[in-house]
């Protein structure tokens, strides 16, 4: 049993290789991150369960801890943050995204400032939000960056289906987000 006490608590179970048939309960608010370097195998023998608030209340309005499970290693969250939290990386809306390497349709500095205010009591300006964010522990940063990642995947799917949109039939935006968080090569250009 893992007990989170605060909405910003992030409990982690990390294995360099495999996690097999883990039976884990998490009580309270916050997050549980389960990450396997290779395989996360649960089948019908393992479970990851959020039990909710231990006193029966819903202090955050969202109930118990969220659970994030990943296998195959961690994403490159630092590179993802550099791309999606810097307004200098915003693409020219009049040009095709595929022709603008290193650019993205949307950057999330406004959403970052709002999230910091809501989750961490941040009172600074939007311009100072990135420095505040960079000083947070990596597990706290990942909570926000996963939200950005899923927002980009959702937007990419919607753009694909918008026949009147600039990227109709193209999942470029979603593929770009996936490639940034989970690159195919390491920093030296070797395949991962």
Which residues does each PLM region occupy?
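Low-complexity, glycine- and small/polar-enriched segments
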Residues: 1-192
